[in-house]
Structures are given as C-alpha cells and as structure tokens.
Regions:
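ABC transporter nucleotide-binding domains
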Residues: 2-5, 12-184, 189-203, 209
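ABC transporter nucleotide-binding domain
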Residues: 169-254
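Structural motif detector for alpha-helix initiation sites
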Residues: 92, 213, 284-288
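Short, charged/small-residue-rich alpha-helical element at the C-terminal edge
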Residues: 222-294
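Generic structural signal for individual residues within well-ordered alpha-helical segments
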Residues: 74, 96, 111, 166, ...
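C-terminal end-of-chain micro-motif
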Residues: 11, 296-297
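Short low-complexity, flexible loop/linker segments enriched in glycine and/or proline
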Residues: 200, 293-296
Length: 297
C-alpha cells in the first residue's frame, strides 16, 4: 500500500510544556484519518509540524516515498488550518482565481471545484455574503484546486450549525470516494466515527490508540448488571478473567467484556454461582465509551 505520510517519534516542546510527545503513525493512500483528542491534546500542533508552519523539537516525518523534500511534497498537499480567510469584497470566483495564480493552476479548475462543493451557483457572490458553512466549503474548494494527493483539515466543522456540519461531512466522504487521502483533526467523536476509516487518539500529546475505527468499536461490548447483594456480585465479576474494567454507580455495575459472551450465558453463570440478578443488559461499546476509557485519567 502506498504511503502518504510517515511520522516517527515526533516531539514538540513549548518551553516546559510538551505539546506532542514521541508520536509515531503512518498514513496510507486512500484512507480518511482522524486525529482525535480533547482540546490541548496536540492535534493542531501535529498538523502544523507536518505542514512546516511549526518547528519540531525532535523526531522526524517523511512525505510520500521519503525521498521528496517537504517543500516539493507540500505541492501535493491541500490544507485548511485556520478559519477560511478570503478577501470579503471579492467574489468566490475572483478569490479562487487569485489562489490559482499563486499555485500555478489553470483557471479551468475553478468551476470544477466550485461544482464539487456545491457553490457554482454562488461563484459571482461576494465572500462577505457567505454563511460560515459556505465559507468553509469555499476553503475546501481552494485547497483542492491543485488536485492534492492528501487534504488536511483542522476541526472542519467547528462553529457550524447542524446543516453545515452535515454538508461538510458529506463533502469529506465524497472527496474521499474520489481517491483523495484525508487527514483531519477533531474533538468530535461522532465526526470521526461517521467519516473516518482510521483514528489516532491523543491525550496531552501522547498517542493512546492508532488503527482502524471499525476495529476499535468491534469490542466485545459491556454489561449493565444489578443484584440485591452488589458487593457479592462485584467480587465475583472481579474474580473472572472474561471481565475487564468494572465500575459501579448508584448500584448499577458496568462490566466490560474481554471475551465474547452473551447475556444468557452471563445470567446462567451468575445463577449457578448463587447470584440472582435484578437487572441485566448487554450493550455494544461505542467509540465514545472507548475514547472515554482511553482518556480517563
């Protein structure tokens, strides 16, 4: 599989603060990668480093085959790191025409990209008349003018209303379906779950998980249990290796499964050991629960 970006032991310090710590992961062609983490986890710093706008402290990264200089590699990259920033008194077409001149791209690309982001009918409207969602879509059109191999987006739906969020997510999926690799930073769990094929989870600059999204959420699930004797039930669950993390809140026990097991089998196991349940529900563990487990201090 063709490699787009390789990051090895990347570290960035701002004085005494370590924003990114010994981070390594690889991005392969054709996938949608999400860097997921709470605010301050190092997502934007990581993107800034690979785009050469933030200097790394140590470690390294390589674009494409590893023999391409960062300067040349970035010609194949489209990126939106800050909020969309165009001349407000110029039309969408005029703004993109200016970008084409800077990037050395033919003007014929403008209508093609405006149509892709569903703004062709507003090509002659001034940027200052656009909604925030439209501004973000215009920024994506701008980033795609040079037909990049990878599109990098930092919090692409931040500040948008539900309709704008849906439009941007649908656009990301459309762009990915056409073969463009995408790397996005987000603190929104459902965003990563809906649009990404792979996820890198960060907390305080450290990688907690890296891999396919579907593998992360294909765990064995968890059980919600209640019994009249909560302490006895807790002691039994803790003695069995098929149960991982166990927590109790207001008499409701949540037990995460380390092995496949259905509710019927659990009920029988407990009954055979003299424990009668008053409540038993098996649930599928969502990306949110996985994320909260990983980032739990």
């Amino acid at each position: 599989m063709e490699t787009i970006l390789t990051i090895n032991n990347l570290t960035k310090k701002f004085g005494f603060l370590t924003a990114v710590k010994d981070l390594s992961f690889t991005i392969n062609k054709g996938n949608v990668y999400g860097i997921l983490g709470p605010n301050g986890s190092g997502k934007s710093t990581t993107l800034g480093i690979v785009l050469n706008v933030v200097n790394k402290t140590s470690g390294d990264f390589h674009w494409f085959d590893g023999n391409t200089s960062t300067h040349d590699a970035l010609k194949k990259v489209g990126a939106i790191i800050e909020r969309p920033n165009f001349y407000p008194y110029m039309t969408a077409y005029q703004n993109l025409k200016l970008v084409c001149k800077i990037k050395g791209v033919p003007f014929s690309k403008i209508d093609e990209k405006l149509e892709l982001v569903k703004l062709l009918d507003r090509k002659d409207s001034k940027f200052q008349t656009f909604s925030l969602g439209m501004k973000q879509r215009l920024a994506i059109a701008s980033a795609l003018l040079n037909d990049p191999e990878i599109l990098i987006l930092d919090e692409p739906t931040n500040g948008l209303d539900p309709q704008g969020i849906h439009q941007i997510r649908s656009l990301i999926q459309l762009i990915a379906s056409q073969g463009t690799t995408i790397l996005l930073a987000s603190h929104l769990l459902d965003e990563v779950e809906k649009v990404c094929t792979h996820v890198v989870i960060l907390r305080k600059g450290e990688k907690l998980y890296s891999g396919p999204v579907d593998e992360m959420i294909s765990s064995h699930g968890f059980l919600e249990l209640k019994a009249e004797d909560t302490n006895n039930l807790m002691a039994f669950l803790e003695s069995k290796k098929m149960f991982g993390k166990i927590k109790v809140e207001d008499g409701l026990i949540t037990a995460f499964l380390d092995e496949p097991m259905d509710a019927k089998s659990v009920n029988k196991l407990l009954f055979d050991n003299g424990i009668v349940l008053t409540h038993l529900v098996k649930r599928k563990e969502s990306l949110e629960e996985q994320f909260l487990q990983l980032t739990d201090n």
